[in-house]
């Protein structure tokens, strides 16, 4: 047994790092330019998998329709979204005369959009506009942009 003791530390270290990245931390690559200029395409994003309550303005990583995406939460349960389908503009909890749809965010759901409004497929255009809490993988705690040049 003593001759295998040197293996114990690397195995424990590997298991600890694996557990950390599968239960607490998320590290991924931003797949599109929908969050520009805030987070450029190809940036490394670091997230916290221990998601508590989400609020307006939080940037989240989630799985939706088989894809891992990054968007900003703009409406939480109970909020009302006034959406203009003609130009994609919206307001939250503030009535607007141009609204073509009025949506109330259900419990355990969120309305999310990309910061690059003209370059984002998000809650404004999805058939079901609401992202469920179960689809959320992590809340962003930072991003590290990499130039594509």
For each feature predicted by the language model, list its residue ranges.
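Extended hydrophobic leader/signal-anchor segments used for secretion and membrane insertion
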Residues: 1-149
